[in-house]
């Protein structure tokens, strides 16, 4: 799903950027730490960059089982530079491993940064970055499954995405564009999912000081229109609550097959107003997307919790995970770390032989589509504009009034969160009664 930008509504487009020259297999690049990397075959090309298979330099050619990829673009282009800053600050292997260890995770779906540098070829300078290699993206799998994921799979995916968001948020960044095409399966383990494309990752809290809430008409509707946050619709810089709101829309689409505003994506104001209306009436959103009786109560509780967040408030990530875990219990399941991409009907798995084939294809896929890992020229210019905006004074947001700093909100808001926890317990009890009836 392509981004829908305000540039399409009359703003001038960015200046054209140079295309990357294609390198031959076997070319050796030397990163800033003097480590050498050998290129394999190209596996993707976008508007101005290329992606190649890569491995540490040796006398052997880089094979199809290469563990890494290298992203290359002309050094005077912007996207890779922006993405590189995120990886250097937040995605070094030792940082990720420390987080996994201290938070007792099996893995963390943030690609690891292995190195970067500049490379001269034919009198031209190129910037490159080495990162992990991945398999298929979730958008392809979603479409192959008639645009449905099972309820268990949606909840499993979302738990892992919450792990990712907590990590990048704690490292002062927000993603701003969570969607299926930016979620890639591990090349070797189809039960692991990774969030990619940090070309527009926004440093919302540099040096511990949160950006202030400020609406900028020039920035309205930034992002992928059907998923972007209400803040983004109003031209406000990305924040933690925006990432969580976007994840909520993804969950609803993955489970129901659509979002209520998808019928008129040509009108950004219609999309914005629809989201505001449904944010204020989550029950109506659930009724619209899930007209059947078996509604996913955990998603409603998640959306209710997220809408209480202030612009600068630190989310209670474990509370959100607990909501989704209660949803798994309600359907008689648990967080087993398995992603089942079988065909589904009405949120339930419908087994068919082809599902094993698709899972194998997802596991063996060597395609890292450059469109899923790089941003467009328009995104680059607009990201630069966002970073240049000076935040002056707080403005009340429709989601709630911003608070100062990067801390959590006051005790009254905590009481609202406690109320949600009580709702979660009621949801769990209803799930238990449902299972007992089924056993009888």
From Swiss-Prot:
SUPFAM superfamilies linked to this entry: Protein kinase-like (PK-like)
Stated consequence of mutating residue 263 to G: Results in impaired Cajal bodies assembly
Ranges of compositional bias, category Polar residues: 379-391, 398-410
Residues bearing the modification Phosphoserine: 342, 376
Free-text disruption phenotype from the record: VRK1 knockdown significantly impairs cortical neuronal migration, and affects the cell cycle of neuronal progenitors.
Region (Disordered): 379-440
EC number: 2.7.11.1
Record's subcellular location: Nucleus; Cytoplasm; Nucleus, Cajal body
Residues of the active site: 177
Keyword Disulfide bond assigned: no
Catalytic activity: L-seryl-[protein] + ATP = O-phospho-L-seryl-[protein] + ADP + H(+); L-threonyl-[protein] + ATP = O-phospho-L-threonyl-[protein] + ADP + H(+)
Regulation: Active in presence of Mn(2+), Mg(2+) and Zn(2+), but is not functional with Ca(2+) or Cu(2+). Has a higher affinity for Mn(2+) than for Mg(2+). RAN inhibits its autophosphorylation and its ability to phosphorylate histone H3.
Tissue expression summary: Highly expressed in testis. Expressed in liver, kidney and muscle. Weakly expressed in thymus, bone marrow and spleen.
One Gene Ontology cellular component: chromatin
UniProt entry keywords in alphabetical sequence: ATP-binding, Cell cycle, Cell division, Cytoplasm, Isopeptide bond, Kinase, Mitosis, Nucleotide-binding, Nucleus, Phosphoprotein, Serine/threonine-protein kinase, Transferase, Ubl conjugation
GO molecular function, one term: histone H3T3 kinase activity
InterPro entries (alphabetical): CK1_Ser-Thr_kinase (IPR050235), Kinase-like_dom_sf (IPR011009), Prot_kinase_dom (IPR000719), Protein_kinase_ATP_BS (IPR017441), Ser/Thr_kinase_AS (IPR008271)
Pfam families in the record: Pkinase
Location of the Protein kinase domain: 37-317
Description of post-translational modifications: Autophosphorylated at various serine and threonine residues. Autophosphorylation does not impair its ability to phosphorylate p53/TP53. Phosphorylation by PLK3 leads to induction of Golgi fragmentation during mitosis.
Example of a GO biological process term: Cajal body organization
Superkingdom of this protein's organism: Eukaryota
Oligomer status and interactors: Interacts with HDAC1, KAT2B, SETDB1, KDM3A and KDM4A. Associates with the nucleosome through interactions with nucleosome DNA, histone H2A and histone H2B; the interaction with H2A and H2B is mediated by the nucleosome acidic patch, a cluster of negatively charged residues of H2A and H2B forming a cleft within the nucleosome core.
PANTHER family on file: CASEIN KINASE-RELATED
Similarity section: Belongs to the protein kinase superfamily. CK1 Ser/Thr protein kinase family. VRK subfamily.
Record protein name field: Serine/threonine-protein kinase VRK1
